[in-house]
Regions:
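Charged/polar interaction segments and conserved charged motifs
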Residues: 1-6, 96-123, 168-173
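Extracellular-loop-to-transmembrane junctions of the mid-late helices
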Residues: 2-14, 123-168
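Hydrophobic alpha-helical transmembrane segments of multi-pass membrane proteins
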Residues: 8-29, 33-96, 113-133, 180-191
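Alpha-helical transmembrane segments in multipass membrane proteins, preferentially the mid-helix core
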Residues: 20-24, 92-100, 152-175
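Transmembrane helix-loop junctions in multipass membrane proteins, especially transporters and channels
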Residues: 29, 57-64, 99-105, 131-139, ...
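Membrane-helix boundary/juxtamembrane motif in polytopic membrane proteins
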Residues: 105-115, 142-150, 164-186
Length: 191
């Protein structure tokens, strides 16, 4: 029995990301740092959407006590993966904005991509020091706890840096900054 239809949005997101993946990877691309970062962003988003759909289906088809007894460990590990993927997506986006802002960063990107990878691994390792708390709000199962605080903090830092870099380069009138401005607008609207 379905408690709620909360899995529909993640499922549609997964389908949309699959279509985007097929369209993006079916075309030939120029090998530049921006495209490498976009590859990471789009693949991470797809993996996250599929895993999110699975977690939401589990939560929508089971009672809270069953989720806590049978699926807690899977959901806990899934949330570590979500946290890492969100961090990868937002740090890749921040790196993308820095690269398009500083011409010299093209050369430095190949050297610094290893540093970015090390930061991702260190962040992922740090997630093992925290667990999640599952809470039931009506028919919906939500996640809270120190793991989420770590995730929100890391993502907020990346968003702030992205917005600062974009605002510092607003005079360039480069359409590549549009995603950062759209994120800022969405954050203002949703508050």
């Amino acid at each position: 029995m379905l408690k709620s239809l909360e899995f529909e949005v993640p499922m549609i997101s997964a389908i949309f990301m699959l279509i985007l993946l097929i369209a993006y990877f079916s075309k030939k691309r120029v090998k530049i740092p921006e495209n490498s970062l976009f590859n990471v962003i789009i693949l991470s988003s797809f993996i996250m959407a599929v895993l999110d759909t699975i977690v939401h289906i589990i939560c929508a088809t089971n009672e809270f006590s069953v989720i806590m007894d049978s699926y807690y460990e899977f959901i806990n590990i899934s949330n570590r993966i979500f946290s890492l993927l969100f961090f990868i997506i937002f740090s890749s986006f921040t790196t993308y904005l820095i690269i398009i802002s500083i011409k010299k960063s093209y050369d430095g990107f190949n050297k610094n991509k290893y540093i970015l990878g090390i930061v991702w691994v260190l962040y992922f390792i740090s997630t093992f020091f925290f667990n999640i708390d599952l809470i039931e709000v009506g028919n919906i199962v939500n996640v809270s706890g120190n793991m989420m605080i770590l995730s929100y903090s890391a993502i907020t830092i990346n968003l702030v840096v992205s917005i600062i870099v974009s605002l510092a380069n607003i005079k360039k009138k480069d359409k590549r900054y549009l995603p950062a401005f759209l994120m800022l607008l969405l954050m203002v609207i949703t508050r």
